[in-house]
């Protein structure tokens, strides 16, 4: 018996991790569309937004506190000494910052501007009352302390790594949907850019999850690997003045990497995973 068999409450985890944020974020969306944006309204949006982000982590924490073996496994996987190497950091930066910069270079051959390499210092979206940079850096931390503390392992207990990634990809697309209704938020901008941008966003999530889960498993289920990858992807896609079409090129780069990754590590993706 492996430790993964202890991660045996996926329905509980995923149900509450979907329902609570959805309720909070639809409330946030309602406040964002009020004609008068007072300080109280903006604070309300911030509180609801952060509470929605944090809630899956709290659901996971509730499950960890009920089982000593799970709690010990969590502490082990949060150790920076476990598989968190300079090689891992370099690979993550190459996959995130490297891919977006490569996409920007390729885009110039199709007439897009080198201005994309300008570090704007201003994200493409806004957030009520707190800096958008706070959202970009805080979200990867609290999300991965949910998804890669309990969520991924709960799926790996039943499914292969590939199936786990596909299931979670669908879940994560739906999980983000309420944010598309929040005025001025990143996801509402993606929808406003049109169907192609929305499809690319959804497709990129599946590739992102496949790569992140591969890194997670290759580096000993270290949660900080997932946090860093998510953080680097968020900041890398917002720090430059990247054209939305260039992100489609980045998705294609991810696709090529994923094809090579699965071909090389076929057994890891399709055999029963053992922690």
Range-by-range predicted roles:
Residues 2-140, 168, 240-275:
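Specific transmembrane helices
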Residues 146, 150-151, 182-193:
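Membrane-interface interhelical connector segments
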Residues 100-109, 143, 163-184:
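Transmembrane alpha-helix/helix-exit interface in multi-pass inner-membrane proteins
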Residues 3-5, 83-85, 121-122, 178-180, ...:
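Hydrophobic, membrane-facing alpha-helical anchors
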Residues 23-26, 165, 190-254:
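Functionally important transmembrane alpha-helices
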Residues 136-141, 173, 201-206:
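Residue-level hotspots within the lipid-embedded alpha helices of multi-pass solute transporters
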Residues 142-174, 217-222:
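Membrane-interface helix/loop boundary segments of multi-pass membrane proteins
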Residues 102, 138, 151, 208-212:
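Hydrophobic/aromatic residues in alpha-helical transmembrane segments
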């Amino acid at each position: 018996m492996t430790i993964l068999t202890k991660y045996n409450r996926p329905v509980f985890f995923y149900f509450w991790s979907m329902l609570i944020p959805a309720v909070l974020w639809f409330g946030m969306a309602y406040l964002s569309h009020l004609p008068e944006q007072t300080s109280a309204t903006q604070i309300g949006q911030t509180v609801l937004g952060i509470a929605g982000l944090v809630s899956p982590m709290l659901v996971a924490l509730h499950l960890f506190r009920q089982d000593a073996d799970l709690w010990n496994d969590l502490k082990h996987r949060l150790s920076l000494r476990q598989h968190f190497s300079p090689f891992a950091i370099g690979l993550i930066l190459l996959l995130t910052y490297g891919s977006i910069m490569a996409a920007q270079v390729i885009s110039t051959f199709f007439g897009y501007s080198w201005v994309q390499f300008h570090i704007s210092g201003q994200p493409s979206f806004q957030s009520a009352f707190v800096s958008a940079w706070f959202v970009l850096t805080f979200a990867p931390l609290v999300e991965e302390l949910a998804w890669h503390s309990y969520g991924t392992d709960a799926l790996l207990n039943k499914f292969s790594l590939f199936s786990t990634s596909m299931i979670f990809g669908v879940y994560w697309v739906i999980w983000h949907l309420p944010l598309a209704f929040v005025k001025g938020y990143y996801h509402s901008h993606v929808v406003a850019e049109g169907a192609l941008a929305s499809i690319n966003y959804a497709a990129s999530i599946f590739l992102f999850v496949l790569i992140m889960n591969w890194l997670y498993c290759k580096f000993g289920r270290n949660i900080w690997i997932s946090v860093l990858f998510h953080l680097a992807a968020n900041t890398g896609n917002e720090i430059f003045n990247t054209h939305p079409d260039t992100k489609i090129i980045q998705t294609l780069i991810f696709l090529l990497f994923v094809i090579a990754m699965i071909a090389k590590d076929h057994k890891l993706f399709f055999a029963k995973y053992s922690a």
